[in-house]
Swiss-Prot record:
Molecular function terms from GO: prenyltransferase activity
Native source species: Arabidopsis thaliana
Keyword Transferase attached: yes
Family: Belongs to the UPP synthase family.
EC annotation from Swiss-Prot or TrEMBL: 2.5.1.-
Name listed for the protein in its UniProt record: Dehydrodolichyl diphosphate synthase 2
Pathway, per record: Protein modification; protein glycosylation
A GO cellular component annotation in the UniProt record: chloroplast stroma
Keyword rRNA processing: no
GO term, biological process aspect, one: protein glycosylation
């Protein structure tokens, strides 16, 4: 999927072009960025293997659970994993590729993680796709990010639905393209009763936004006389947060790729007792081995939730 934090690559510097140039370039590239460039095909062996069929694999969450790797213990698996998918832009820049090649490679990485979550019994996977802070990016970049997201939903959601995956989108939808909103509504409706894995994609989201919209919702309920001010507590706030779409709203484990050591305004309320794991790999390079390493680290920790074990 898309990257949370993508530096503008020097191989395609948006600031160098005038508005007309950007529009022409977008019209020429809007279809091509949704496919791998020839140079990407040459370079993808670094991640997928030149002759590997991995880049053509669809999102799945296999019907049967795969035996866990011997390093992991089923009783210690997290119920909810959240991921900040960072590094698509740098991955592309390092290989002399176009920015959309990095984002498309990021989609391939997400496919693998979704499949592993389904096989290994993880019940919720939340990924940070587009932050409210990302709206300051050049319009052309935002447009192709949303086009990639829309195309991915259209082409993959039937595979996910077939494999009993529920898809939920959280975040401020007021600025999203109408065509994307239609796809989101359809995908959520078709998959709403699926139970094997819930994939939550945060788009136009930030932790601050989530708390703010929750407070506004509570304020409206007070104004309408539904509740008294004295009734406001943590439980009520949690009911208004956008993660109320899942039975397990609090991530057990947060993974951030690319070596950055921060949570970047993601799920600020929900991460209160979450275990954090920072991976050095850029997101397109993050796969099975990195995921196992993160899960092993999680399983070795003692979670006290503010208490003390005797």
């Amino acid at each position: 999927m898309l990257s949370l934090r993508v530096p503008t690559p020097t191989s395609f510097d948006f600031r160098r072009y005038q508005a007309g140039d950007l529009e022409r370039r977008w019209r020429l590239s809007r279809d091509s960025f949704l496919s791998f460039s020839p140079k990407f095909e040459e370079n993808r062996g670094f991640r997928f293997g030149v002759k590997s069929s991995k880049s053509d694999v669809s999102f799945t969450a296999a019907e049967e659970e795969e035996t866990l790797p011997e390093e992991l213990h089923a009783e210690l698996m997290p119920k909810h994993v959240a991921i900040i998918m960072d590094g698509n832009g740098r991955w592309a820049k390092n290989r002399g590729l176009q920015p959309w090649d990095g984002h498309r490679a990021g989609v391939e990485a997400l496919k693998e993680i979704v499949e592993l979550c389904g096989k290994w019994g993880i019940q919720v996977l939340t990924v940070f796709a587009f932050s409210t802070d990302n709206w300051i990016r050049p319009r052309i970049e935002i447009d192709f990010l949303f086009s990639l997201f829309e195309r991915s939903l259209k082409t993959e959601f039937q595979n996910l639905a077939k494999n009993n995956v529920r898809i939920s989108i959280i975040g401020d939808s007021s600025k999203l393209p109408k065509s994307l909103l239609r796809v989101i509504n359809e995908v959520e409706e078709v998959t709403k009763n699926n139970t094997r894995l819930q994939l939550i994609v945060a788009v136009g989201y930030s932790g601050k936004y989530d708390v703010l919209q929750a407070c506004r919702g509570i304020a409206r309920r007070v104004k309408d006389g539904e509740i008294e001010v004295e009734e406001i507590d943590e439980r009520l706030i949690e009911e208004e947060l956008e993660t109320n779409c899942t039975e397990f709203p609090y991530p057990d484990l947060l993974i951030r790729t690319s070596g950055e050591l921060r949570v970047s305004n993601f799920l600020l309320w929900q991460l209160a007792y979450t275990e954090l794991f920072f991976a050095q790999e850029l997101w397109p390079d993050f796969g099975r081995s990195g995921f196992i390493e993160a899960l092993m680290s999680f399983q070795q920790r003692q979670r006290r939730f503010g208490g003390r074990k005797s």
